[in-house]
């Protein structure tokens, strides 16, 4: 759990960075959000591991510490959505958050594919579209925002 401590801090910094802009379009917001994760492959790799087991085996005080910080990052995202998209209904903002945050747990395995996986997909006839962390994240955020 110790390695995950910097996840909420990163999100808080990312939200703070976005808060420096008085206004952003949906596309610009998606772009900024994607850029905050683009260089965080290690974070995304940790998140894609068996998170449930990691939390289950963590000491209660560490897990609580993480959950407090995680809650702060959810609230930071809500503040950004409220600032940039005041016309968006609260339910839609919540839908964005509760779709985007779980989505982050799957970014790494969809964007970092080793040669063995690539070869297996090719042999299996899987028409897989390879995307970067930025591309996948930006597409998801744009879709969730209706952009």
Feature locations, PLM:
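Secondary-structure edge/capping motif, primarily at the C-terminal ends of alpha-helices
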Residues: 14-22, 51-55, 81, 115
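Hydrophobic alpha-helical connector segments
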Residues: 2, 6-45, 90, 96-100
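Non-membrane alpha-helical structural segments and their capping/turn regions in soluble enzymes
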Residues: 5, 27, 64-75, 94, ...
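Short, charged/polar micro-motifs that form catalytic or ligand-binding hotspots
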Residues: 23, 64-67, 86, 90
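Short secondary-structure transition hinges
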Residues: 34, 38-75, 128
């Amino acid at each position: 759990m110790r390695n995950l401590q910097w996840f909420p801090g990163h999100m808080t910094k990312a939200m703070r960075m976005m808060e420096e802009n008085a206004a952003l379009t949906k596309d610009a917001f998606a772009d900024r959000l994607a850029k905050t994760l683009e260089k965080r492959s290690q974070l995304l790799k940790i998140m894609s591991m068996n998170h449930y087991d990691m939390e289950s085996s963590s000491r209660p005080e560490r897990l609580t510490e993480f959950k407090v910080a995680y809650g702060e990052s959810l609230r930071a995202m809500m503040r950004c959505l409220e600032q940039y998209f005041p016309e968006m209904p609260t339910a839609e903002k919540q839908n964005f958050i509760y779709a985007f945050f779980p989505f982050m747990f799957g970014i790494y395995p969809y964007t970092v594919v080793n040669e063995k996986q690539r070869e297996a997909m090719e042999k299996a006839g899987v028409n897989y579209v390879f995307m970067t962390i930025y591309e996948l994240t930006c597409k998801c955020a744009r879709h969730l925002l209706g952009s």
